[in-house]
């Protein structure tokens, strides 16, 4: 409280007080290092460079924010759902940190109006707002630390926009979404039960692997075949979206399997980008109230 009063007094003498006030309305506190928040909203399409000539955009902050957001949301979900199993907690967290939810949250708090990007660039994508939200979390972490990040998520995001209990009951069928993607892109997908064992309490545990054109995509465990398939499909969808080397291996395997493949000219890079955007659209088709 005292810190905020001191910040308000200092603000009166700053030339950029309008920017500070804008961030205060979103954060609930005044930034200490406002440059972090400004960079969090700087899309790579602007081609801005630092004094040393390095690209200046929000990608590094996005990387950091993604990791911090996973930890914070995991922390919140763990404390809220006492006694729930790991699979339940993982799925609930995934529903919050998925790209469509982050896109909506960015709009709700007004980040979409603050993002700087080049209108001449064609590099914009359907998850630019969500990326900026993650970068914003990274900025808060560097500026104020983990606890402040957690308070921001609890008070400014979860409480006003997300009903955790309602969200946890909403089922997301990752297997059907992966199959839908494979059909759109003419890819062969298989689900293989590779192990069945018992845990310490003699409950059956299943492990499933997903392969695309014979290439291992992801594996998942669960207390039923369905749960293990869902977890494996979820991991595979993330890999499709975020691992270009994996997708290159899949495309190569598709060609070797004599299935019509995309051209390997530079246009194929655009095809891979389109596939990744399709993944975001497919993963995000469920309606989550934020």
From Swiss-Prot:
The prosthetic group or cofactor this protein requires is: Mg(2+)
Q: Where is the active site?
A: 66, 134
What's an example GO BP annotation here? Answer: tRNA processing
- Could you tell me what reaction this enzyme catalyses? Endonucleolytic cleavage to 5'-phosphomonoester
Tell me which EC number(s) this protein carries. 3.1.26.3
Stretches with biased composition (Polar residues): 267-279
Q: Where is the RNase III domain?
A: 20-145
Q: Which UniProt keywords apply?
A: Cytoplasm, Endonuclease, Hydrolase, Magnesium, Metal-binding, mRNA processing, Nuclease, RNA-binding, rRNA processing, rRNA-binding, tRNA processing
| GO molecular function terms listed in the Swiss-Prot or TrEMBL record | double-stranded RNA binding; metal ion binding; ribonuclease III activity; rRNA binding
UniProt cross-references to InterPro entries, sorted A to Z: dsRBD_dom, RNase_III, RNase_III_dom, RNase_III_sf
Q: What class of enzyme is it?
A: hydrolase
Boundaries of every DRBM domain copy: 173-242
Which residues lie within the region annotated Disordered?
254-290
Q: What does this protein do?
A: Digests double-stranded RNA. Involved in the processing of primary rRNA transcript to yield the immediate precursors to the large and small rRNAs (23S and 16S). Processes some mRNAs, and tRNAs when they are encoded in the rRNA operon. Processes pre-crRNA and tracrRNA of type II CRISPR loci if present in the organism.
The UniProt entry's sequence similarity note says: Belongs to the ribonuclease III family.
Name the UniProt record assigns to this protein:
Ribonuclease 3
Species for this entry? Bacteroides fragilis (strain ATCC 25285 / DSM 2151 / CCUG 4856 / JCM 11019 / LMG 10263 / NCTC 9343 / Onslow / VPI 2553 / EN-2)
């Amino acid at each position: 409280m005292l810190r905020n009063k001191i910040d308000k007094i200092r603000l009166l003498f700053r030339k950029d007080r309008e920017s500070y006030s804008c961030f205060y309305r979103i954060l609930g506190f005044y930034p200490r290092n406002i440059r972090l928040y400004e960079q969090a909203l700087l899309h790579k399409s602007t081609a801005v460079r630092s004094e040393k000539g390095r690209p200046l955009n929000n990608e590094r902050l996005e990387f950091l924010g993604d990791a911090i957001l996973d930890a914070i949301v995991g922390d919140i979900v763990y404390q809220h759902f006492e006694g729930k199993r790991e699979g339940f907690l993982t799925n609930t967290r995934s529903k919050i940190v998925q790209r469509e939810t982050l896109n909506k949250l960015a709009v709700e708090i007004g980040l979409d109006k603050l993002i700087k990007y080049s209108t001449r660039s064609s590099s914009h994508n359907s998850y630019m707002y969500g990326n900026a939200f993650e970068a914003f979390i990274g900025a808060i972490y560097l500026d104020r630390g983990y606890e402040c990040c957690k308070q921001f998520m609890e008070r400014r995001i979860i409480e006003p926009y997300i009903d955790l209990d309602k969200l946890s009951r909403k089922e997301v069928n990752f297997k059907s979404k992966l199959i839908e993607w494979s059909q759109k892109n003419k890819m062969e997908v298989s689900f293989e039960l590779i192990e069945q064992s018992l845990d310490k309490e003699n409950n059956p545990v299943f492990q499933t692997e997903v392969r695309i054109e014979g290439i291992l995509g992801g594996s998942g465990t669960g207390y039923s075949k369905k749960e293990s398939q869902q977890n494996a499909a979820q991991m595979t969808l993330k890999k499709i979206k975020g691992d270009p080397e994996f997708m290159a291996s899949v495309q190569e395997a598709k060609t070797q399997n004599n299935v019509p493949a995309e051209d390997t000219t530079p246009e194929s890079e655009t095809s891979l980008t389109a596939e990744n955007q399709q993944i975001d659209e497919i993963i995000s088709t469920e309606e989550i109230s934020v």
